[in-house]
Amino acid sequence: MPELPEVETVRRGLEQKLNNFIIKKVEVCRDSTVAFPNKKEDFIGGLNNSLLYKWNRRGKYLIAELKKLGNENGRFPLEKFSKNNGFLIVHLRMTGYFKFINNSAQPCKHTRIRVFDNKNNELRYIDVRSFGQMWWIKEGLSPNKIIKGLGSLGPEPFSKDFDEIYLKKVISKRTKSIKAILLDQTIVAGIGNIYADESLYSAGISPFREARTIKKNELIKLKESIVTVLKNSIGSGGTTFSDFRDLEGENGNFGLQTNVYRRTGKECRKCGNLIERKKISGRSTHWCPKCQK
């Protein structure tokens, strides 16, 4: 599943590529991709003649601010001659990704949503396993109330609210493993299997440790490791092990730099011990038994 760095890579690509992209036509190729409104016709009607004004990210959610253009559309700056039109929100889930296509051509087999501008450029959403979802939340409605997962997210790893004091507070009585805690989106937003493993390795903490046993100095190191690992991955365009692509169809390169993730049986880059793998809460976990205590 795309995690924070992959979603942030997509967000940056969308923001750069879709400058002044005005939606003139929407085609829903798979109804189940539209999570809200209940009728796809309302989803299509809500997006038509909207400016994709600004792209944000919250955890693993992409959030586009929309502007509805009036009679003066075509005048610049467009946002001055328009009114707010709510949000287009996307969760890529397991295999979803966007592709920008100049002079739109026939859709591929797994195309789920097609969005066109008046120049026949297309923003195409492709999803092999079809778990990804989109919401059009009209102006006046609360995205956090409509999308349960969005409203329950914990702080962003880069925010000032995510520090060792916060971590100590949320784990002080937790008997769960620290790996399970990091995967809990209500505790910290955006971290998944790859970056939990890599951050714990960088911090020298065993993924099997009970969260409540981790000391303050270890929490400081863990927080710093999380931020560093995520920033490094964003700088590399995220990680591609299966379906993730950026807007240009390119793979992320961080997978070439991982220290433990998917390196089972290979030598630890620090100590030479072999990397091991075991499941925690149904998720494959990779670690170095010598470097992580």
From Swiss-Prot:
Keyword set includes Lyase: yes
Keyword annotations of the record: DNA damage, DNA repair, DNA-binding, Glycosidase, Hydrolase, Lyase, Metal-binding, Multifunctional enzyme, Zinc, Zinc-finger
Zinc fingers, FPG-type class: 259-293
Positions of DNA binding: 110, 129, 174
Cofactor descriptive note: Binds 1 zinc ion per subunit.
Family the UniProt entry places it in: Belongs to the FPG family.
Protein name: Formamidopyrimidine-DNA glycosylase
Encoding gene per record: mutM
